[in-house]
Amino acid sequence: MGPCAAPPAFAQGKAADPRKPDPKAAQAPAPVRPSAVDKINDWGVYAAGAGKAKACYVLAEPKERAPKTLKRDPGYVFITQRPGEGVRNEVSVVMGFDVKPDSTPKAEIGAASFPMIAKGGNLWLKNPAQETDFVNALRKSPRLIVKADSLRGNTTTDTYALAGVGAALDRATKECQ
């Protein structure tokens, strides 16, 4: 509770009426909206928060999505840094659809293949210890290919262009120092 907020009624020895809102009760702060910092080729650089709560990330949308006939929400790949939490290069993918449970989604960068795990429509590297290897591979390759099976059994492929990803990651690192 901030220094200007009034303590809730129960802390003042009064019983609060649960049917009536307490106008003096502290309200939760509004969520912090990310700010666009830079755009390098297909990669946006964003930052949110301040101090130890600051987070920076790079984000891109796929250049190609297959099969083209499937209707789905937009997809994205994120690489996040949260220095205050000791997080660097956290990789996540939004597929735009729910991924089939117990399937084996994967990310391919050049000759390297990285197994992923799914929860709903989101993917993360199965082995977080590979995040640095994943990011180093991104810096050296022209494309990232993410493959996953939908709940309906469709195998989907999202292809991301990697031109500029290294500069975008460097910019995010600088922003989050």
Spans of model-derived segments:
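A generic "folded-domain core" signal
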Residues: F10-Q177
